[in-house]
């Protein structure tokens, strides 16, 4: 059990916390103190009544502002994140001490040298890599990285060795060792060829006019080129599957298969055979069918604990067993996961494996809700109108001048999917050649409630405040549909309201005066 105690910087507060644990006979496993006013405690599980009583007593300590449970200590979180990152790297990476002895290595290193981690730690870098004097380089106290061509097991590598400096108790930077990364020259050449040949139009179907969506697309284009697992998060209807496919198409795997599985729509007993195959029936699973390509696991938060364990094993070494068979199969597949759920929350509740979360959370893409991207609403509307009209072979209707105001005022709880369905539904029943606000039927939705949801608490104070401010303006603008009326209602100047509406994309195009 781990607690995060929010507190003031007061002399003796930590001692009072420890005395409280001693008084209750609680065995403390660890304590970590954060300089920004947080103390982390790690101790054995308690009965509910004892735990509730302890929480109440901690809150009564002078200087304590709050206390809550957390799934991990800061050092544990950093260790798990580092381990997941190292495991995801396709290049061999070694960490060596001042004697050039290996103290950490990732799976790619173990595979290259044909040694398990515990045996690699018995070697020095010089015993593993010929042609470079590691000790002499470390003794020279280098300040910059050094690149060197090396040959290992007949393979050519570009070795990059980077010095690691840490601060001592006197705030002096002391050299403690180095990190060695080995880049295969063959792999680097293939990557350059793939970059030149990648599908530059992969993201062309994604509308990105708003700054937030532009940033997400730029981030996705970079992540698409990597082979590590990708986790895409976002509310329902934000386009997670569209981004997953675009990442595949923009990657070196574009010419290989892309398969998608919704973990929430398939019974638990069928998921294993769908993913890994069924030997008695001679059926290949998704991973085997997509060898060399990508697999999207949608709604990963719905996966059962048993399948989570099997997925974790597959992510670690790329091997699996078909149902009803002992033979191991190895494939090269990039796994992309998508979810609208808060995986950290599921980890805290014991519904999602902590180690799997860290394995998936190496590369993440968070898609913003449509209400946070008002500049994208009309371009999306124009796209859906044109697409539907062309599919039906009918003339494209004109968009009414006041349509922008109505659509950008709405909060869109269903995001892009809801907008698309609303436009399609309106066009199927449209009389005439103009799409007007009254043609689009939208369920009542209180936009003001958006700002107090859990997702609205993410980001900086300015971002949270902006979301709340936009929600208030969106809600009130319905009942006070002019800048002067709205300004009077809120007790601010007409100019201030006009600027705010323009900032959030809520202003009408025609003159409101």
From Swiss-Prot:
What InterPro entries does the record point to? AAA+_ATPase, ACT-like_dom_sf, ACT_dom, Homeodomain-like_sf, HTH_TyrR, P-loop_NTPase, PAS, PAS-like_dom_sf
Describe the effect of residue 184 to V/L.
Reduces the activation function to 45% of the wild-type value. Does not affect repression of aroF
Q: Which residues form the ACT domain?
A: 2-72
Record's keyword terms, sorted: Activator, Aromatic hydrocarbons catabolism, ATP-binding, Cytoplasm, DNA-binding, Nucleotide-binding, Repressor, Transcription, Transcription regulation
Give the GO biological process terms: catabolic process; negative regulation of DNA-templated transcription; positive regulation of DNA-templated transcription; regulation of DNA-templated transcription
Further facts: Regulation of individual transcription units within the regulon reflects their physiological function and is determined by the position and nature of the recognition sites (TyrR boxes) associated with each of the promoters.
UniProt-recorded name of the protein:
HTH-type transcriptional regulatory protein TyrR
Gene that this sequence comes from: tyrR
